[in-house]
Amino acid sequence: CRQRRHQPDGVFPKNMFSLDVGIDLGTSSPLVYIKGMGIILAEPSVVAIQASTKKPLAVGSEAKRMLGRTPGSIVAIRPMKDGVIADFEVTQKMLEYFIKKARSLARTLPWSKIRVVVSVPSGITEVEKRAVVESAEQAGADKTFLIDEPMAAAIGAGLPVTEPGGSMIIDIGGGTTEVAVISLGGIVVCISERTAGDKMDEAIVQHIKRKYNLLIGERTAEAIKIKIGSADELSEEKRMEIKGRDLVAGLPRTVTITSEEIRA
């Protein structure tokens, strides 16, 4: 990655007639922040649409509950993949939902300008960056700024990013893992790998299928990762009871798994 400079103490220029919104457009769980109000929305990156018209029916938590349960006429999809836009049109609909929500909560003047800063993986291409900007602006943003995710994560973690000493940040998201060294307000070096939390969930699904002949969904896999997953050995190993569909009998079945096998 090339070295880039940011203005961490003031991403937006001061303007009293604007609504300043920050969006972490994550692969699995976007966050929406309003200046002066804090985080106002944290929902899954899922949109339920009418298959024939692509008309959005639900966004976020409501749409995620439809995953795997929708009739053929309704499709619940993730418009982001590996940290970048996989479906431009649906991402735009999701951003429209975020921006409308921000405007309604902030109760801004009708003519107030909406300025949005979006965090993006440091390794994406100029074409992918342009897709993010165009999606945000077509969704209603008057001005869109981009910031690299490692820099945004470092600022959020309170690291001294403007000082001459180096600070390392490891940001594991749903679609990308990024490791960066930051100094003097810029990213000195970074590595972006499109392997992260979603790949872990997929690995858990495959493990349960191979070992127990049991099919589980992505929500169950994510719950396993969060509840009993670990990188190092635990002083006391954990156990968890899960339910799935037996691949032979086709009936629901319950098994107990351990943190040790998930870690392995």
PLM-predicted stretches and their roles:
Residues 1-172, 180-264:
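Nucleotide/phosphate-binding catalytic cleft detector across ATP-hydrolyzing
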